């Protein structure tokens, strides 16, 4: 059993609202670089994130909302249509493939849960996760899906 694993995939950086938006996943690469530079992280410690399924995301989010997020990320939703769902706002603007990018962050958290629950690691960190402001049917505070809530429901299952 490993003492700790760090869940990371370069595609996690696709969770990006815009170049000027205050929420930026640069912290992922900066943290990885820092940990590597001080000898606290090796390639063997990195576990790839996986994409959460719609069924897993639906543990904490309405299926209708998941479909709205997919439509928004494929350019099939106007900001006015997305506004009741918290999508297309200043906090949570639409961006290409937003469902896929968000599902990868949720899947990264579930990957961390699996590593600990299956006894593969004592500790696991998905620094791309922790997006806890999302509601069951509404984005909020830069968070499309609430990976923390999904993980809790996932563990309970």
Map each language-model feature to its residues:
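HDAC/HDAC-like amidohydrolase catalytic core signature
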Residues: 1-157
């Amino acid at each position: 059993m490993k003492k700790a694993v760090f869940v990371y995939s370069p595609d996690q950086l696709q969770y990006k609202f815009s170049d000027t938006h205050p929420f930026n996943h640069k912290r992922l690469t900066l943290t990885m670089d820092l940990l590597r530079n001080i000898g606290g992280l090796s390639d063997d410690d990195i576990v790839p994130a996986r994409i959460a399924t719609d069924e897993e995301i639906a543990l904490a989010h309405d299926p209708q909302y998941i479909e709205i997020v997919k439509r928004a990320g494929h350019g099939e939703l106007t900001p006015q249509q997305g506004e009741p769902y918290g999508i297309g706002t200043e906090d949570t603007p639409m961006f290409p493939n937003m469902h896929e990018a968000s599902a990868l962050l949720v899947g990264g958290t579930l990957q961390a849960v699996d590593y600990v629950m299956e006894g593969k690691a004592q500790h696991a960190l998905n620094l791309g996760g922790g997006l806890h402001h999302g509601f069951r049917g509404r984005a909020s505070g830069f968070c499309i899906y609430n990976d923390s809530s999904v993980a809790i429901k996932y563990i309970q299952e």
